[in-house]
């Protein structure tokens, strides 16, 4: 694709962080061989940097409820084979000291920390968990979770300046705050990981409460039931509606605006949305339009996949 977008530096690469490490394991087992075998189908200015998620029943989980039940060893074998980092989404914001001893989550960390191949990481919210991970599993890199709802730019910059984080995912409402993003030095721009396809109402004031409700559910604790007040909540996630969100970052935005400005990390949400929507995300963000039908056909004809 070099030469088609002269504003983009030749060496610029967009790195995608994709949802469903466990939740969409079967999907990626079909998609990644296609991605490797037919690179001509996909943009040459982007690559898959990581897959993120958690299996169901993870105490430390947050953001969304994990739903995958595949063997973590199979997951790691897949990511190793394709040179992709695996990230555990341990973004529960309500952890207490007694939760740090959870056997299942520690077992996952040991497995991911000891895996050969690309370095694996953890998406984290709790400072308590952060210190535990740094102390016990220093082999894992850390990502600051969007569940912190960093809407204040000064707070975002402070988070970016913390050396313990490889990347920081700000709230999507800062996605187009270029008057402030442009003030960041390149070292900090390299750490900003934009959440591209959020469908949440841009004016929502309950985002933190929504994430806390998920954290309580993962802990098996009672508390206020969060009910989304968005007028579109009943319709669920719609990619077409996400595209109309003021914070949406599409493929053309990445090529023409973010990469030329020195931003290269892009997170795609969708762990709880189903593999049919995941396919639409991958078509939009990774796939050259003439080859959309080729990718669709290859995956539709895979009898092992349940896309709907």
Please tell me what each predicted stretch does:
Residues 2-155, 159, 164-308:
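Active-site pocket-lining/capping segments in soluble small-molecule metabolic enzymes
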């Amino acid at each position: 694709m070099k030469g088609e977008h002269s504003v983009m530096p030749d060496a610029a690469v967009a790195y995608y962080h994709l949802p469903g490490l466990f939740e969409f394991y079967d999907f990626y087992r079909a998609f990644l061989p296609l991605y490797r075998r037919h690179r001509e189908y996909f943009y040459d200015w982007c690559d898959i940097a990581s897959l993120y998620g958690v299996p169901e029943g993870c105490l430390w989980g947050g953001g969304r409820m994990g739903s995958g039940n595949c063997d973590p060893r199979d997951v790691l074998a897949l990511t190793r084979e394709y040179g992709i980092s695996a990230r555990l989404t341990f973004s529960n914001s309500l952890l207490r000291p007694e939760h740090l001893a959870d056997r299942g989550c520690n077992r996952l960390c040991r497995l991911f920390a000891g895996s050969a191949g690309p370095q694996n990481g953890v998406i984290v919210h709790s400072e308590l968990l952060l210190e535990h991970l740094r102390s016990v599993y220093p082999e894992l890199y850390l990502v600051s979770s969007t569940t912190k709802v960093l809407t204040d730019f000064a707070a975002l910059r402070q988070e970016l300046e913390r050396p313990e984080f490889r990347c920081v995912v700000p709230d999507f409402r800062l996605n187009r705050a270029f008057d402030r993003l442009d003030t960041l030095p390149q070292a900090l721009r390299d750490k900003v990981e934009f959440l591209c396809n959020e469908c949440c109402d841009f004016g929502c004031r309950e985002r933190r409460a929504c994430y806390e409700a998920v954290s309580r559910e993962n802990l098996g604790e009672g508390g206020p039931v969060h009910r989304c007040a968005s007028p579109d909540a009943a319709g669920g996630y719609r990619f077409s509606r996400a595209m109309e969100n003021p914070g949406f970052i599409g493929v053309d935005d990445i090529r023409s605006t973010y990469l030329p400005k020195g931003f290269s990390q892009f997170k795609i949400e969708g762990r709880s949305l189903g593999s049919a929507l995941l396919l639409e995300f991958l078509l939009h963000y990774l796939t050259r339009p003439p080859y959309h039908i080729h990718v669709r056909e290859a995956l539709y004809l895979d009898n092992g996949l349940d896309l709907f």
